[in-house]
Amino acid sequence: MAGGRDLEAQILRRVRSIPPGFVATYGDLCPEAPRRAGAVMASNDDPGLPWHRVVRADGSLAVGERQRRLLEAEGVPFRGHRVDLREAWFAVEDSV
């Protein structure tokens, strides 16, 4: 796994690659350290970063209602309180 700034840049590149209407999980962004992906996103202040397209491994939301509203506006399907990953999961590339 890359370290430091390289890892951070790769995680952010992966987030930006998720198209509207789809989601990826923290584990997709950084399989060896999903929490690191969350920390990188939390410390990023780029208003254009589509942070709302990243969800937990079970499809639940980390941020809550604001995240849900943004995803619903993009047409992301839900099953109850979770994103329907069978329909909305995006396979990110650019290995971290």
Q: Model segments located where?
A:
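Nucleic acid-binding interface residues in structured DNA/RNA-binding domains
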Residues: 1-96
